[in-house]
Amino acid sequence: MKVKIGLKCSDCEDINYSTTKNAKTNTEKLELKKFCPRENKHTLHKEIKLKS
């Protein structure tokens, strides 16, 4: 079952990316280093739930 998630910047708290993930196979929270346009650098982005 795919669920919609957002990736929130840990520095500026903006939700910069949205994607889907398989909730059955990936139970842990997703953490990725992605580019933050507000900070203009690569920062850690953590998974949050989006309203679907």
UniProtKB/Swiss-Prot annotation:
Q: What is this protein called?
A: Large ribosomal subunit protein bL33
What's one GO BP annotation on this UniProt entry?
translation
UniProt record similarity statement:
Belongs to the bacterial ribosomal protein bL33 family.
Q: Which PROSITE patterns match?
A: RIBOSOMAL_L33
Question: What is the species of this protein?
Answer: Helicobacter pylori (strain ATCC 700392 / 26695) (Campylobacter pylori)
Which superkingdom, per the lineage?
Bacteria
Please give the Pfam families that the UniProt record associates with this protein.
Ribosomal_L33 (PF00471)
GO CC terms, sorted: cytoplasm; ribonucleoprotein complex; ribosome
Q: Does the keyword Ribosomal protein apply?
A: yes
The major lineage groups are: Bacteria, Pseudomonadati, Campylobacterota, Epsilonproteobacteria, Campylobacterales
Which GO MF terms does the UniProt record name? structural constituent of ribosome
The alphabetical list of record keywords is: Ribonucleoprotein, Ribosomal protein
Q: What gene is it encoded by?
A: rpmG
